[in-house]
């Protein structure tokens, strides 16, 4: 059984549908061709608004027809169709939206007086339709303008219809009672359409006020401000207010903008970028905008409250993106708009941001958070901002004169300038990776030319205020030389070492990029020159040459066009040949560059990070970042994203790193932790190690692989091990402090050396081993050559003959290991005696850890003693006279290549605590064997005479 209210709703919808159709044919359809001239911008705008109104009217009619159909179905089949099937109840939101869109389209036309303008174009036609219009309306004065009549015809039926909705739905709610299943739907519909009445009234009031405003403005101001979207919320002529420091004659608050009028000038502020600060005196409040701050002062507290409330809620509404429903300020929380927002703004004031457009996050009138800056000249910056300045990671593009060429800076910024680690790719194809301060290269960094550069170079070292300064390495690919030394103001200045591709080495003093004073020059054939030079290391002035054979030439040297090198001096051929090690193994740079001060630019950022407590926001700025880098310079938009690998992606947050560090303090666990940390390029310790590897390769790989730099390199590796241990201790201190604990007092030298040589050095040495061992190979090439000849000669002898030659006592020979011929003494068997010791010693080449190499040597000694004990059938401790011949035998059968380089590397890198102990003794014994095998009688292919083991000592 249907209610009377449902029948009344049906009749209401029938009448309204017919009215909409009638209005469409009588008013809307004729208005479209009567719109102002489309060739005029205002004419086009009016036509667009009328078309939008026509579209909204059609949508409203369609919804009304659908509602009518649902009512008809309900009345036709009341038993099978429930009350909830009515569109007004189940689809109240949809009906509401159709009404809202219509009223918004209507008021937009009303604000720009589109009806009046259209009526003027067909005034005769509309005068003839007055009677028909009066039939549509109730209470329309015959003296009213045609435009006003058109407006009433388009609005009044809608207002009446909504009013009837509310009345009938209220009555329906009373009829069905509180416990009816659809009671909640009815109450919701009553609320929505009641709110719609309030919304329509507010919209009409604002449109009337806005329309009236245009008549009070001069022509130019009206043209600037008159837009369909504007709705006037407050006018200072109604509630007076003064603005400082800009003395505005009139203040207009629209729903999307705040406008200050000052003479012919119009100052417009987007409400999405207006922040309200309550005042202190009850009559004043403050507004913040991206470029200006204002004080609004009303005559009394009531006026101040009106303005502050309306501005606050207008800002809220603008940020919300749609009009408040049902009225301004309804349903929005909190009472104050958020301080942080997202918006776009183009700066106008003079300064570095003039004409730049910022799009991104804001806070209280300043860019704050993530955003993008674009200048008209093509400059772009995307990244993080703080209080209006670039701060944090950001990418800056600077266009160059060449088309599609940019300088690209992927850096960390502080207070508007580059500060911290960055990667810069220049339009010249040069790339800089390193640190900045106040926008200039400062600290450690690498500058490298492009691969196709006519004069390729790479500088790895320290910078100061944009110039090379301090310790640094420069490789000149064109000249095939590398400079290792000190810099000042972008020039070589101070002690330096130069090495060339040809193997020539120079050490001397530089001043303003030129050699000054005496220096030394070592040639590849080990000739030595001591004197003065030209820039390209040509002998010039007084000097002395010492040749490999001992001859010396002392005098004045020079060169000239067509003359080559010439000299006047004394040639001394009577001098004795020099000690080969005096020149061949002479080391350069030692003492000139204190090892602890060479790479402070690498260590310092890590120390700063630790001293600051390892904050997350400084991790990339101080420790660097991994970034996908390309030399190909692309269009600017391609650069506005940076594929950075954040440290937390692979190793977790800094908190996780420190927590894990605390869980691995026991020796075995610590070793596993450090191995994992050093092998991960995203871990702070791993990053530090990667940078140290880079400096080491820049110095000692390629052209720098020169035997005269071996000591410089090995002391550098040991220093790096100390610094890495100190870095670990720094992280441990921070981890403990975060737990409220303290790190034990500074460790003593012995404890530190034990950890550095026993723990850190073995873990980090593989990263430097290739370049370091190459230097040892070159330094000991001559001895290793003699040693190899001796090994080759000794390998020709069968086991028994070699044992006899080495004067190994026969009762120590492991004869059971041999398959003998009828002549036992001259067995043809080779490589069978002391086989276990030989195979053990060969393992010395399978590790780079000095301690493990010494352990191999100790096990070899044990295998030799074990074999002898087996032969004798009892425990036997070898005296030195018996050990050395047997050790030489094992060394000759192990055939270890470059044994001299191995021995010297082990001695240089082993723990100082082993000095004087068993390892030191065994290494000395191995070194004695190595030196003896180099002797002439060991190298010549002849049956040597007997020798005695005491000759080794």
Swiss-Prot record:
SMART domains: MORN. The keyword Amino-acid biosynthesis does not apply. The gene is ALS2CL. It comes from the Eukaryota. MORN repeats lie at residues 358-380, 381-403, 409-431, 432-452, 459-479, 483-505, 506-528, 529-552. This is ALS2 C-terminal-like protein. Homodimer. Forms a heteromeric complex with ALS2. Interacts with ALS2 and RAB5A. GO terms for biological process: endosomal transport. Residues 796-942 form the VPS9 domain. Its main location: cytoplasm. Expressed in heart and kidney. SUPFAM superfamilies: DBL homology domain (DH-domain), Histone H3 K4-specific methyltransferase SET7/9 N-terminal domain, VPS9 domain. The lineage of its organism: Eukaryota, Metazoa, Chordata, Craniata, Vertebrata. Keywords: Cytoplasm, GTPase activation, Repeat. InterPro entries: Alsin_GEFs/MotNeuronReg, DBL_dom_sf, MORN, VPS9, VPS9_dom_sf. The keyword DNA repair does not apply. One of its GO terms (cellular component) is cytoplasm.
């Amino acid at each position: 059984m249907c209610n009377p209210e449902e029948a009344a709703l049906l009749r209401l919808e029938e009448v309204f549908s017919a009215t909409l159709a009638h209005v469409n044919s009588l008013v809307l359809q004729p208005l479209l061709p009567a719109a102002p001239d489309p060739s005029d911008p205002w004419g086009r705008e009016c036509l667009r608004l009328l078309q939008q109104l026509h579209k909204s009217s059609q949508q409203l009619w369609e919804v009304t027809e659908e509602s009518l159909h649902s009512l008809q179905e309900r009345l036709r089949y009341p038993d099978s169709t429930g009350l909830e099937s009515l569109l007004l109840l189940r689809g109240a939101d949809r009906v509401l939206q159709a009404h809202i869109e219509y009223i918004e389209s209507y008021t937009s036309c009303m604000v720009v007086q589109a009806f009046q303008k259209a009526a003027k174009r067909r005034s005769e036609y509309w005068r003839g339709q007055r009677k028909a219009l009066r039939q549509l309306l109730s209470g329309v004065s015959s003296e009213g303008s045609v435009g006003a009549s058109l407006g009433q015809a388009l609005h009044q039926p809608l207002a009446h219809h909504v009013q009837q909705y509310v009345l009938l739905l209220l009555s329906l709610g009373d009829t069905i009672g509180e416990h009816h299943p659809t009671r909640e739907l009815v109450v919701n519909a009553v609320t929505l359409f009641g709110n719609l009445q309030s919304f329509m009234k507010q919209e009409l009031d604002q449109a009337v006020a806005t329309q009236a405003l245009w008549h009070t403005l001069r022509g130019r101001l009206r043209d600037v401000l008159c837009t369909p979207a504007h709705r006037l919320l407050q006018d200072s002529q109604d509630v007076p207010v003064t603005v400082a420091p800009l003395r505005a004659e009139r203040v207009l608050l629209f729903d999307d903008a705040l406008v200050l009028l000052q003479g012919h000038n119009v100052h417009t502020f987007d409400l999405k970028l207006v922040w309200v600060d309550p005042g202190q005196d009850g009559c004043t409040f403050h507004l913040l905008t991206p470029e200006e701050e204002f004080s609004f002062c009303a005559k009394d507290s009531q006026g101040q409250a009106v303005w502050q409330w309306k501005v606050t809620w207008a800002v809220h509404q603008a940020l919300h993106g749609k009009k408040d429903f049902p009225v301004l300020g309804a349903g929005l929380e909190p009472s104050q708009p958020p301080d942080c927002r997202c918006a776009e703004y183009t700066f106008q004031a003079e300064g570095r941001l003039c004409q730049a457009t910022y799009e991104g996050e804001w806070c209280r009138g300043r860019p704050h958070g993530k955003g993008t800056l674009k200048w008209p000249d093509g400059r772009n910056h995307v990244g993080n901002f703080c209080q209006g300045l670039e701060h944090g990671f950001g990418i800056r593009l600077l266009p160059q004169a060449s088309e599609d060429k940019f300088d690209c800076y992927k850096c960390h910024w502080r207070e508007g300038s580059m500060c911290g680690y960055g990667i810069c790719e220049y339009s010249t194809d040069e790339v800089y990776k390193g640190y900045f301060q106040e926008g200039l290269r400062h600290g450690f960094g690498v500058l490298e030319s492009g691969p196709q550069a006519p004069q390729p170079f790479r500088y790895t070292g320290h910078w100061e205020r944009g110039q090379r300064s301090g310790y640094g390495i420069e490789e000149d690919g064109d000249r095939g030389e590398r400079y290792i030394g000190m810099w000042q103001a972008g020039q070589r200045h101070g002690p330096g070492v130069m090495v060339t591709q040809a193997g020539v080495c120079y050490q001397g003093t530089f001043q303003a990029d030129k050699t000054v004073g005496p220096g030394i020059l070592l040639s590849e054939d080990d000739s030595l020159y001591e004197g003065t030079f030209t820039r390209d290391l040509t002998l010039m002035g007084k000097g002395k040459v010492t040749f490999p054979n001992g001859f010396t030439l002392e005098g004045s040297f020079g060169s000239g066009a067509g003359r080559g090198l010439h000299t006047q001096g004394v040639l001394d051929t009577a001098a004795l040949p020099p000690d080969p090690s005096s020149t061949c193994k002479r080391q350069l740079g030692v003492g000139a560059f204190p090892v602890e001060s060479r790479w402070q630019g690498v260590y310092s950022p890590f120390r700063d990070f630790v001293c600051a407590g390892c904050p997350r926001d400084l991790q990339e700025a101080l420790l660097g970042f991994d970034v996908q880098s390309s030399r190909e310079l692309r269009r600017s938009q391609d650069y506005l994203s940076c594929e950075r690998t954040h440290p937390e992606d692979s190793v977790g947050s800094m908190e996780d790193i420190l927590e894990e560090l605390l869980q691995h303090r026991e020796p075995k666990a610590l070793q596993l932790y450090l191995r994992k940390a050093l092998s991960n390029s995203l871990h702070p310790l791993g990053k530090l190690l990667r940078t140290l590897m880079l400096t080491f390769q820049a110095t000692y790989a390629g052209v720098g692989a020169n035997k005269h730099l071996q000591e410089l390199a090995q002391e550098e590796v040991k220093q790096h091990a100390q610094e890495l241990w100190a870095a670990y201790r720094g992280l441990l201190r921070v981890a403990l402090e975060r737990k409220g604990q303290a790190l034990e007092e500074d460790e003593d030298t012995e404890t530190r050396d034990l950890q550095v040589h026993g723990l850190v050095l073995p873990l980090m040495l593989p990263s430097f081993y290739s370049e370091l061992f190459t230097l040892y190979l070159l330094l000991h090439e001559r001895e290793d050559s003699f040693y190899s000849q001796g090994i080759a000669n000794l390998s020709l002898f069968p086991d028994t003959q070699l044992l006899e030659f080495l004067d190994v006592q026969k009762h120590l020979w492991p004869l059971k290991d041999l398959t003998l011929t009828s002549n036992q003494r001259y067995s043809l068997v080779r490589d069978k005696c002391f086989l276990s010791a030989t195979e053990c010693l060969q393992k010395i080449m399978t590790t780079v850890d000095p301690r493990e190499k010494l352990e191999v040597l100790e096990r070899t000694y044990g295998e030799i003693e074990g074999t002898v004990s087996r032969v004798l059938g009892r425990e036997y401790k070898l005296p030195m006279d018996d050990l050395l011949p047997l050790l030489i035998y094992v060394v000759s059968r192990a055939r270890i290549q470059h044994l001299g380089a191995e021995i010297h590397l082990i001695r240089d890198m082993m723990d100082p605590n082993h000095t004087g102990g068993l390892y030191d003794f065994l290494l000395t014994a191995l070194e004695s064997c190595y030196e003896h095998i180099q002797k002439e009688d060991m190298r010549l292919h002849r049956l040597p005479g007997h020798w005695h083991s005491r000759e080794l000592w």
